């Protein structure tokens, strides 16, 4: 920005884009740089103002979703493209964004564990950097594999954390009960926990809901209005809640390593100890459990 170039950060969800926007507004306040946000749900008048600011070059830092890929979004002097959670975008989408400038520098980011061989195939033309250290002040995430018989103790621990003022997630592999799949559903767990934790504000979120409804619930959780969030994997990208200290993943044997890693990464973002309980209801241990413990953060 100080050199006159524009930078754009593209995120896969509006919620994540808003969180990035709030962070950049705070971090750049001392540098007299005012970030601009561009998302699909903006009012037409606000979107028009953002587009004018981008095309004139006044906007030096732009945080956006895929809305920035539209043909009528024109940059004056684009110099840097950052793609967050890059695996959620296609190659053509990333190229289209970098093609809005000349000689654009590109940075792609992900916290998803990608094997070296696959990384070499996907990013053979890019330099790969790994951040192996934890952000300052974080204590790490303790990961445990638990059986059906231990579920009550786990839920008691969740209640203890909520009474201490912290927040929790409970993740299920299904939205509704299925006759063909023997697994817990988000709807059933939500009903159960509402009865069990009736002194706390519990909400349900899943992929079949309207985007506006999902975002509202997630924003309420992020602001501390919701104590416990029951969800499907819809939360694996795009929510940052430092006060969330516990995650319970039901039927963890049904998730892969990358999903479990992404889900677990929703907790442990603050200064408190964090806990992830992998609830396994079959005799077979999830292949990913050993890998998660080996990379326990």
Which functions belong to the PLM regions below?
Residues 1-286:
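Inter-lobe coupling/hinge segments of SF2-like helicase ATPases
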Residues 290-297:
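Conserved small/polar residues in nucleotide/adenosyl-binding loops
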């Amino acid at each position: 920005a100080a050199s006159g170039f524009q930078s754009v950060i593209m995120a896969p969800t509006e919620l994540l884009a808003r969180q990035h926007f709030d962070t950049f507004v705070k971090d750049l306040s001392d540098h007299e740089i005012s970030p601009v946000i561009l998302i699909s749900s903006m009012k037409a008048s606000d979107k028009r103002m953002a587009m004018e600011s981008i095309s004139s070059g006044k906007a030096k830092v732009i945080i956006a979703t895929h809305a920035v890929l539209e043909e009528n979004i024109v940059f004056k002097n684009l110099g840097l493209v950052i793609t967050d959670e890059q695996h959620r975008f296609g190659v053509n989408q990333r190229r289209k964004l970098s093609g809005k400038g000349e000689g654009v520098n590109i940075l792609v980011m992900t916290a998803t564990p990608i094997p070296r061989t696959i990384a070499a195939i996907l990013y053979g033309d890019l330099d790969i950097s790994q951040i192996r250290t934890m952000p300052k002040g974080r204590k790490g995430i303790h990961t445990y594999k638990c059986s059906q018989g231990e579920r009550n103790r786990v839920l008691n621990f969740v209640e203890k954390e909520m009474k201490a003022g912290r927040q929790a997630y409970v993740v299920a592999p299904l939205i509704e009960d299925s006759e063909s799949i023997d697994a817990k559903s988000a709807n059933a767990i939500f009903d159960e926990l509402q009865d069990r934790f009736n002194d706390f504000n519990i909400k349900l979120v899943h992929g079949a809901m309207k985007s506006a409804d999902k975002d509202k619930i997630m924003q309420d959780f992020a602001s501390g209005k919701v104590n416990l969030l029951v969800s499907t994997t819809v939360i694996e990208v795009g929510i940052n809640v430092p006060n969330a200290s516990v995650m319970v993943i039901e039927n963890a044997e049904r998730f892969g390593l990358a999903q479990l890693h992404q889900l677990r990464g929703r907790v442990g973002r603050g200064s408190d100890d964090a806990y992830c309980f992998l609830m396994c209801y079959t005799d077979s241990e999830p292949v990913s459990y050993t890998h998660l413990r080996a990379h326990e953060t």
